[in-house]
């Protein structure tokens, strides 16, 4: 299931599905009064959002280019043939991916186009769907931004003059397509990575990573604020849909290595919290497990966080088998998550650890920048340092440590294996991206062009030499490698099936 969006009058729901796993979706529209599907059928669309007009007569959607890049926004009138659909926006720069959505206030349709390093936003009033889309601020190199509607104002989330992002505000009745219409609302703070802000009638909910932990901060219109307190144990927190514009309740989920996904409502002003539901774990005593954060030291002296969970009866005496998981790419911050299946390992004396190497975003944008392009090997060195720390501190048995990762995390575990085959007894590589030089040299493949900003273009120096120096496929030599379990997706549009096979 991809899209699932109600029209504003709750007459229709637009929903899409992918039945082959190739991320090519078919969109249908259901009449909620009758339960019947309308004749409207939109095949071969992207899972990049949909947006309704206020009257429920028009629907915006996105289609891909031949490389499967979401590139074009269309406007479809309900009940009319697709051939009559209107092209609203077409992104010709192959580095940019397009999405469409609606502000929580339901007053604006927002089109967002973004590369790995810059972005641009366009808007259309939801009650004037046939108007042309207007650019908020023209795109600039290395500047990212997005907007949300906040009643009498608009809020912008941007890295302009702020590596870890800041928030700006502009009056709704001002010409906010001009840069000088925007004033600072939340200042930049190095190391506090602001991911975005959800606007509600009376407050903003700011989502950020701070000291390698995700958190939510509530900012009221009088500029006072409150942090949602979730304790010190490494955890994940995710907002729910929270579709209601004028509300004082915030719904979110929390989970950790020792706590199942738990749904809460919290009053934004008082902080009063109500537990709504926790994923049941029958016959499990959660007090049997303990989690902690430890810090490894990389070769250049950088401290790297590692989250560790074990059974309380598992001794720290270098006897426990262990699994180390990592990703470390695309500024993706990887919070700890709960897994019932993992409990089976922990009950049998295993230790499970989650590395946060450079290349992710856990410690701010600079943490990501220090693990991409010509600094990519920091990601592998950090993960190796995490493994060495687990061994040296007696948390795991030196001869029984496995490493696991998928996609770009498959590149990570492949590089760790070829660099330090002695450190791991086994490797789990899920849809691994291991032949990076060949893949990134072919601009006809899905994602390649936009990924040059993350990895570099191996058709040029110094990237060719640097990438060949760490590519797992190009650095496999006769050696005593650990056992490898590799998986592939037959129709995977990101990592083609032949790459894990290599």
What positions do the PLM features span?
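A fold-wide structural signal in alpha/beta-hydrolase
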Residues: 322, 346-356
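A flexible loop/linker signature enriched in serine peptidases of the S9 family
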Residues: 17-26, 41-46, 62-72, 82, ...
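Short loop/turn segments that connect beta-strands within beta-propeller blades
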Residues: 31-35, 77-81, 125-129, 171-174, ...
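Non-catalytic accessory segments flanking enzyme active sites
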Residues: 1-5, 16, 96-149, 184, ...
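Hydrophobic beta-strand positions that form the internal "hydrophobic ladder"
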Residues: 13-15, 59, 109, 154-156, ...
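A short beta-strand motif characteristic of beta-propeller blades
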Residues: 36-42, 86-90, 132-137, 182-187, ...
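A conserved hydrophobic secondary-structure block that centers on an alpha-helix together
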Residues: 1-50, 56, 201
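Active-site-proximal cap/loop segments of hydrolase catalytic domains
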Residues: 354-502
């Amino acid at each position: 299931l991809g899209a699932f969006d109600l029209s504003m009058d709750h007459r229709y729901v637009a929903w899409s599905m992918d039945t082959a796993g190739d991320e090519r979706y078919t969109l249908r529209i259901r009449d909620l009064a009758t339960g019947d599907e309308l004749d409207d059928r939109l095949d071969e669309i992207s899972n990049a959002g949909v947006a309704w007009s206020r009257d429920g007569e028009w629907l915006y959607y996105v289609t891909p280019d031949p490389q499967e890049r979401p590139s074009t926004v269309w406007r479809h009138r309900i009940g009319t043939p697709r051939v009559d659909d209107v092209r609203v926006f077409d992104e010709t720069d192959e580095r940019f991916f397009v999405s469409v959505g609606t502000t929580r206030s339901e007053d604006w349709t927002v089109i967002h186009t973004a590369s790995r390093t810059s972005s641009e936003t366009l808007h259309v009033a939801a009650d004037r769907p046939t108007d042309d889309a207007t650019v908020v601020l023209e795109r600039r190199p290395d500047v990212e931004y997005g907007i949300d509607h906040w009643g009498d104002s608009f809020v912008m989330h941007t890295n302009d003059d702020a590596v870890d992002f800041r928030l700006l505000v502009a009056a709704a009745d001002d010409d906010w397509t001009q840069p000088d219409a925007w004033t600072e609302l939340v200042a930049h703070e190095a190391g506090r990575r602001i991911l975005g802000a959800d606007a509600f009638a009376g407050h903003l909910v700011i989502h950020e990573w701070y000291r390698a932990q995700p958190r939510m901060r509530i900012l009221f219109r009088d500029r006072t604020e409150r942090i949602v307190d979730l304790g010190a144990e490494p955890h994940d927190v995710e907002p729910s849909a929270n579709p209601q514009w004028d509300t004082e309740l915030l719904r979110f989920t929390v989970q950790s290595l020792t706590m199942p996904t738990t749904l809460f409502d919290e009053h934004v002003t008082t902080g009063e919290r109500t537990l709504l539901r926790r994923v049941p774990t029958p016959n499990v005593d959660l007090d049997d497990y303990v989690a902690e954060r430890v810090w490894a030291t990389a070769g250049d002296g950088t401290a790297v966080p590692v989250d560790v969970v074990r059974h309380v009866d598992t001794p720290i005496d270098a006897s426990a088998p262990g699994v180390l998981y990592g990703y470390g790419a695309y500024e993706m911050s990887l919070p700890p998550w709960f897994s019932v299946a993992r409990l089976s390992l922990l009950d049998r004396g295993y230790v499970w650890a989650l590395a946060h190497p450079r290349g992710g975003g856990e410690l701010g944008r600079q943490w990501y920048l220090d693990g991409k392009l010509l600094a990519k090997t920091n990601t592998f060195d950090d993960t190796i340092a995490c493994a060495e720390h687990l061994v040296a501190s007696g948390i795991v048995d030196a001869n029984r440590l496995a490493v696991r990762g998928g996609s770009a995390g498959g590149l990570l575990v492949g590089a760790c294996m070829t660099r330090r085959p002695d450190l791991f007894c086994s490797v789990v590589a899920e849809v691994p991206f291991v032949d990076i030089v060949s893949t990134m040299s072919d601009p006809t493949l899905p994602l390649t062009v936009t990924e040059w900003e993350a990895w570099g273009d191996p058709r040029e120096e110094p990237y060719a030499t640097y990438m060949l120096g760490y590519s797992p496929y190009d650095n496999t030599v006769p050696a005593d490698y650990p056992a490898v379990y590799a998986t592939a997706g037959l129709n995977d549009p990101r990592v083609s099936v032949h790459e894990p096979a290599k």
